[in-house]
Swiss-Prot record:
It holds the Pfam family UPF0180. InterPro entries: UPF0180. It comes from the Bacteria. It comes from Bacillus anthracis. This is UPF0180 protein BA_1413/GBAA_1413/BAS1304.
Amino acid sequence: MRIKARIGVENSLTDVQQALKQQGHEVVTLNSEQDAQGCDCCVVTGQDSNMMGIADASIKGSVITAHGLTTDDICQQVESRT
């Protein structure tokens, strides 16, 4: 299966990581700002509005805030943004 996109996902969002892997995305766990580099899109919890500085232009793709969204909602947003 061809990798669709490289998605950075905050460490605590394990259900989102699994769902995106099943859809064929390469998933990178975000532990620091450097992990976001090279990602097409990042998913963060939204508990810290600027988690690890990712809201600054450290990635070229979009940042999706998972707060209040289901895993399916997040996967749909990733699909529409990558």
